[in-house]
Amino acid sequence: AIAAVITFLILFTIFGNALVILAVLTSRSLRAPQNLFLVSLAAADILVATLIIPFSLANELLGYWYFRRTWCEVYLALDVLFCTSSIVHLCAISLDRYWAVSRALEYNCKRTPRRIKCIILTVWLIAAAISLPPLIYKGDQGPQPHGAPQCKLNQEAWYILSSSLGSFFVPCLIMILVYLRIYLIAKRSHRRGPRAKGGPGEGESRQACPVPGGPSASAKLPTLATPVASASEANGPSKPAGEKEEGETPEDPGTQALPPGWATLPNSGQGQKEGVSGASLEEEAEEEEEEEEEEDEPQAVPVSPASVGSPPLQQPQGSRVLATLRGQVLVGRGVGAMSGQWWRRRAQLSREKRFTFVLAVVIGVFVLCWFPFFFSYSLSAICPQQCRVPHGLF
């Protein structure tokens, strides 16, 4: 019965992890750099199921090590390597989740496939450093029954404690602290609500990863446009620059002239009036990637006394009319675009938190499964006589 259950678990492990690797490598929606962690973790689990569990099952059923001594040493090293790699992978994934939630804009620019591969390589090197001592130093392997060869790990206290700390307890402590920190961040951001720091009410604009040779992120376009002159100015002779009519109120210094090249909007009252239709520099840089944002580009339509007799200008949804000393300016949906960017950012954070919760459940179950082994394994080094664990329970 035990052999049948273990065999089913072996096949299920191989099949399930093979599907994970296949899904990440073939699905375009799963080709994010962070999913390389899942590919490496699944590979480690497949290696455990194919190279470790079958020989462990044979050793338990026979009661002795049937295979050669050389393979016993390699088997012990691979056992520590693959199991430690699986646990440290989960630790690396938890750190990746934490950086993605706490420093999303900055870390998303740095989360490249090259960086993720370097982290994965570091994980395997840590696991290899912990698994090498059984190959280099055989140490005390405990009493060997006559005529029944055994294959056991180094039974010296220093190796038991150091391997337990590096393989389980330290990564487990890191994961607990990291997920506690993620929980506190999620709780604080939920309390702050939509008007919290970074919300649309404070004019936050979404930052993009810096592009070499691109426009400066600090460049800003004017919010208000200088409205056109009255009908008498439009139909009468133009005056030299800087010359004002008698009794005319000086121009509000808060209003800025439109940059050259902005498109004009037609008006039914007179041929065409000057108007503006443009996008911020950041939106222009993102135009190719997010074409749907084009409808959120800010527009400013001047409204002057000359247009009183004309049909009323329809105000676009989400726009607003600002009054100046020389008339009114209809400002388009710049704030709406900003708000849309903020809500997209909120949706991204929500997805990160949901994924983090799922990973926390998986890691919690994984830790609960490993804790009994490492706890009893460590007791054999701390108090080998007084805290002896029954062989069947171990």
Swiss-Prot record:
Biased composition (Low complexity): 299-312
Signal peptide (residue range): none
Gene3D superfamilies assigned: Rhodopsin 7-helix transmembrane proteins
Residues covered by region (Disordered): 191-318
Disulfide bonds: 72-151
Topology of this chain in the membrane: Multi-pass membrane protein
PANTHER family, per the entry: ADRENERGIC RECEPTOR-RELATED G-PROTEIN COUPLED RECEPTOR, ALPHA-2B ADRENERGIC RECEPTOR
Family: Belongs to the G-protein coupled receptor 1 family. Adrenergic receptor subfamily. ADRA2B sub-subfamily.
Function: Alpha-2 adrenergic receptors mediate the catecholamine-induced inhibition of adenylate cyclase through the action of G proteins.
Name of the protein in its database record: Alpha-2B adrenergic receptor
